[in-house]
Amino acid sequence: MLCESIRELFSALEPGRRILGIDFGERKIGLALSDPTYLIAIPHSVYHRRNMRQDLGELSAVLRSEDAAVVVMGNPLQSDGLEGEMCQIVRAFAQKLIKKSGVSIYLHDERYTTAMASRATREAGLRRKESQKIDDKISAALVLQQVLDIARAEGIQATGGNNSCL
């Protein structure tokens, strides 16, 4: 189920289970994971897309292997805050992942995270080619970290375990 808020997402999350962060792209999908205490987001991997069936299978496998119970997915709003065509593509993919794996997903504004990830890798001294290999998983970690920070600031805790938003 698509969650409407961070609070709803955490109501579906059993304490101690991880959150998978996804930066969805047309060619690549960046992945990040929360730590079990929901303090930090850790870049995980970059998955190169193949086809819908394999993409969904790969993400379902990561959810199982990493004990992730819910998903935060970047929502690529336009700079004016409105949803564009890519938002609809992301939402459709999220619905398919929900159907395949049964997880709850929260779509979080990802504006500027790709630029932030690129800047961070540049400042770390990585060459452009090296940076492009990891930008997506860093973007996924940035989106997930924003959600973790908001949850902590608002005192939101994992209380669920039914994997379904309220």
Swiss-Prot record:
SMART domains: YqgFc
Taxonomic path: Bacteria, Pseudomonadati, Pseudomonadota, Alphaproteobacteria, Rickettsiales
Predominant subcellular localization, coarse grouping: cytoplasm
SUPFAM superfamilies: Ribonuclease H-like
PANTHER family noted in UniProt: POLYNUCLEOTIDYL TRANSFERASE, RIBONUCLEASE H-LIKE SUPERFAMILY PROTEIN
Top-level taxon: Bacteria
Function recorded in the entry: Could be a nuclease involved in processing of the 5'-end of pre-16S rRNA.
Alphabetically ordered keywords of this record: Cytoplasm, Hydrolase, Nuclease, Ribosome biogenesis
EC number, as in UniProt: 3.1.-.-
A cellular component annotation (GO) from this entry: cytosol
NCBIfam families with a match to the protein in the record: RNAse_H_YqgF
Compartment annotation: Cytoplasm
Enzyme class (EC, first level): hydrolase
Keyword flag Secreted: no
A GO molecular-function descriptor: nuclease activity
UniProt similarity note: Belongs to the YqgF nuclease family.
InterPro entries reported in the protein's UniProt record: RNaseH-like_sf, YqgF, YqgF/RNaseH-like_dom, YqgF/RNaseH-like_dom_sf
Protein name per UniProt: Putative pre-16S rRNA nuclease
Organism: Anaplasma phagocytophilum (strain HZ)
Pfam families to which the protein is assigned, alphabetical: RuvX (PF03652)
